[in-house]
UniProtKB/Swiss-Prot annotation:
UniProt-listed GO biological process terms: thiamine biosynthetic process; thiamine diphosphate biosynthetic process
Entries under Pfam families matching the protein: HK (PF02110)
InterPro entries associated with the record: Hyethyz_kinase, Ribokinase-like
Cofactor: Mg(2+)
Reaction(s) catalysed by this chain's protein: 5-(2-hydroxyethyl)-4-methylthiazole + ATP = 4-methyl-5-(2-phosphooxyethyl)-thiazole + ADP + H(+)
Positions bound to substrate: 50, 198
Its job: Catalyzes the phosphorylation of the hydroxyl group of 4-methyl-5-beta-hydroxyethylthiazole (THZ).
Protein name: Hydroxyethylthiazole kinase
Biological or metabolic pathway of the protein: Cofactor biosynthesis; thiamine diphosphate biosynthesis; 4-methyl-5-(2-phosphoethyl)-thiazole from 5-(2-hydroxyethyl)-4-methylthiazole: step 1/1
Enzyme class: transferase
Binding site for ATP: 125, 171
GO MF annotation, one: hydroxyethylthiazole kinase activity
Entry keyword annotation includes Magnesium: yes
Organism: Escherichia coli (strain 55989 / EAEC)
Length: 262
């Protein structure tokens, strides 16, 4: 399958839509990344909500523009809340995104993620090892870290996309986005981004938000990858290491939104 490139014009158009629609994103994400995820969405112009209580999750999933399910710090009560939210999302046609953190390394979360796939996610975002494991091609990864190159996971991503109907995002040095028929590659970013916890998880939240936008969902999701890589490059140029990277990264996301509004 040919891998196309995303144009700057496509990315800018998607960011304009993002800022214009300001999606309300229901983030059922892991405990490690909540603040960073919320700040990433805010910097881009979205509205985050971290609603995790089982008694509220279903109700809020019907209100939100999009739902994120991230299994990074999965527990049985949290799984129950996530299941309720996904069931409601399917019923109310709220697009939802799955981030199958460490799915190849641990059985409980692998079984849970496979169960959730029957509720038809709009998007799935993971590293190469996670996507390959979710597709049933390999059980790999070193915890949350990948042991495979993103390009090696393209066939698995295409298969998973065709089986689920989801847009599948494989992140790495180059990000690949596919609907099973088309594929887009996004270059850029910096290795320092992997030294800060939460950049991938935050991207999943932005992907979820992009699934709520009008237009070509594949292009919108690919644009999310582009914004994050752009911001990462800008932040690295201004920072001295991981500690100073985070505020510069959030500033860079904000500046990107200001540029498309100018």
């Amino acid at each position: 399958m040919q891998v196309d490139l995303l144009s700057s014009a496509q990315s800018a158009h998607a960011l304009h839509l993002f800022h214009q629609h300001s999606p309300l994103v229901h983030c059922m994400t892991n405990d490690v990344v909540q603040t960073f995820t919320a700040n990433t969405l805010l910097a881009l112009g979205a509205s985050p909500a971290m609603v995790i209580e089982t008694e509220e999750a279903s109700q809020f999933a019907a209100i939100a523009s999009a739902l994120l399910i991230n299994v990074g710090t999965l527990t049985q009560p949290r799984a129950q809340a996530m299941r309720a939210a996904v069931e409601q999302a399917k019923s109310s046609q709220t697009p939802w995104t799955l981030d199958p953190v460490a799915v190849g390394a641990l059985d409980y979360r692998r079984h849970f993620c496979h169960e959730l796939l029957s509720f038809k996610p709009a998007a799935i975002r993971g590293n190469a090892s996670e996507i390959m494991a979710l597709a049933g091609i390999a059980n790999g990864g070193r915890g949350v870290d990948t042991t495979d190159a993103a390009a090696n996971a393209i066939p698995a991503a295409q298969t998973l996309a065709r089986e689920t109907g989801a847009i599948v995002v494989v992140t790495g040095e180059v990000d690949y986005v596919t609907d099973g028929h088309r594929a887009v590659g996004i270059h850029g970013g910096d290795p320092l981004m992997t030294k800060v916890v939460g950049t991938g998880c935050a991207l999943s939240a932005v992907v979820a938000a992009c699934c709520a936008l009008p237009g070509d969902t594949l292009e919108n999701v690919a644009s999310a990858c582009h914004w994050m890589k752009q911001a990462g490059e800008r932040a690295v140029a201004r920072s001295e290491g991981p500690g100073s990277f985070v505020p510069h990264f959030l500033d860079a996301l904000w500046q990107l939104t200001q540029e498309v509004q100018a």
